[in-house]
Amino acid sequence: MGKIIGIDLGTTNSCVAVLDGDKPRVIENAEGERTTASVIAYTDGETLVGQPGGNVNAVTNPTRYTLFAIKRLIGRRFEDEEVQRDIEIMPYKIVKADNGDAWVEAKGQKMAAPQVSAEVLKKMKKTAEDFLGEEVTGAVITVPAYFNDAQAQATKDAGRIAGLEVKRIINEPTAAALAYGLDKSGGDRTIAVYDLGGGTFDISIIEIDEVEGEKTFEVLATNGDTHLGGEDFDNRLINYLVDEFNKEQGINLKNDPLAMQRVKEAAEKAKIELSSTSQTDVNLPYVTADATGPKHMNIKVTRAKLESLVEDLVQRSLEPLKVALADADLSVNDITDVILVGGQTRMPMVQAKVAEFFGKEARRDVNPDEAVAMGAAVQGGVLAGEVKDVLLLDVTPLSLGIETMGAVMTKLVEKNTTIPTKANQVFSTAEDNQSAVTIHVLQGERKQASFNKSLGQFNLEGIQAAPRGMPQIEVTFDLDADGILHVSAKDKQTGKEQKITIQASGGLSDDDIEKMVQEAEANKEADKKFEELATARNQADQMIHGTRKQVEEAGEALPAEEKEKIEAAISELETARKGDDKEAIDAKVQALMTAAQKLMEIAQQQAQAQQAQGGYAGAQQSQEDDVVDAEFEEVKDDKK
């Protein structure tokens, strides 16, 4: 079995790691960075991911073709409250797909969130392949612990579109605990993983038991908020800067996409700086202009001001901590270690609030940007058989059930149940002689069915006519290790059965995914052709420039007819270079090389002549060097 890589597919940044020996290792990308910005830019002929995509964002078109924070949309419906909020703040267009999902618009076409996220995963795959020197097909991908079934399934779809076989989906805090606890000794531990990333927040309570060298990582409880993260902190500061500028200049920058992009980048930079300094200046010259001339932004921001802007967001993250502890039947005194994961945890206020809640400082020996990918790589090692002494017991974050009479949700699997798990329950009909039942699958904690997340529904038909309450319909929930749900319903009398793997009521069908996989492969081929064409054009440029220089240096030594042949070949190559036919360019390069053979001979003769001349001068100098200068003193003979 080949290497199984670990990928942290983040809202703001992504990271890839692999097990190197018995230790997880983060792999640097082509730009030399250990994390890659989850930014995708579509330009003419190619797709840029990471820092190159961010550069396009700033320099060319900041809105239409540059996408970021797509993880906030993955597996979500367009009508979701969180999506509607994002529509107001995102510079790109969020649209409603035919199936009701939240998609984005780029390159003049609608694109599914998994399809866009697949571009980041492809970059992670290529980064790993460049490092390992072999093709990579297997991956463990992490998701926020509080992702619902639809979001986890959509993440798995993104992996398939990227050409990866997703061996396992695991929760981000669980992965961080794996990375942290792998080389720790000293008995059993109960750890709290506080994970505040770019777009999501999770808290997991995890117990690490060690028996005879084998470690068991058991998730006791998890909670969170899938729409709370660093992007929300950024937006608070962005709005403050825009409002202040409006007060000073009377100009609303929200109507200027390019200006807003500059403000966004400046706000992110200021937020980071304020983690290590008490104040900073946001200085943006020529941020916009009106009839009176150019306008500049220069606003001083203090750490105290930033903290006042985001205090409620930090406070919002503390509520899930209380719920998770209660679900685990623990108190803060039972927590051995606190681990901070996610870039936003670098903010001093976040660290202070978490320390205050747990009554202890968080560990400092965990890299918040890399721990999740490293843990995913450990799980990859477990699945590949490279790690033998680790057992991971993850949980489902939300309860699963079906809608029953009276629009009530009846739970079959309670939240925080260890996965994989299987549960079944027998139901009956609500009316006499009912020949079919609809199984409506739900996820959530509310008793009223409509307040929970609808995962899908299907019909079981052909039930024998009988009084209400007599038929026995056995519903089975089978939740796999990825947290993906498989549901079956069986009429115990007739033996008729219906099975489905739950997809969101919407989501991508297998046909959709297969089409996107083919598109990705087609783009891969197109990208390769684009790169080959660019290389051919560059070679043509070099050939034209070099040949013209040699013609000039040859001067009258080059016969006129040879010069005409060369000029004609150059002209033909210039024409071919403007086209898109790589083979035509290569052929004209070869033709120019043939036409310039006489020129090469002349250049060689001139070089030999210069060398010979240089040798003669050197010999002359050598002879002169053999003459020894001496000082003379005339001695007069006094003897006469």
UniProtKB/Swiss-Prot annotation:
Residues 607-622 have a biased composition (Low complexity). The keyword rRNA processing does not apply. Residues 607-640 are annotated as: Disordered. Keywords: ATP-binding, Chaperone, Nucleotide-binding, Phosphoprotein, Stress response. CDD domains: ASKHA_NBD_HSP70_DnaK-like. Induction: By stress conditions e.g. heat shock. GO terms for molecular function: ATP binding; ATP-dependent protein folding chaperone; unfolded protein binding. PROSITE patterns: HSP70_1, HSP70_2, HSP70_3. The modification Phosphothreonine is found at residue 200. InterPro entries: ATPase_NBD, Chaperone_DnaK, Heat_shock_70_CS, HSP70_C_sf, HSP70_peptide-bd_sf, Hsp_70_fam. Residues 623-640 have a biased composition (Acidic residues). PANTHER family: HEAT SHOCK PROTEIN 70KDA. Belongs to the heat shock protein 70 family. Acts as a chaperone. This is Chaperone protein DnaK. The gene is dnaK.
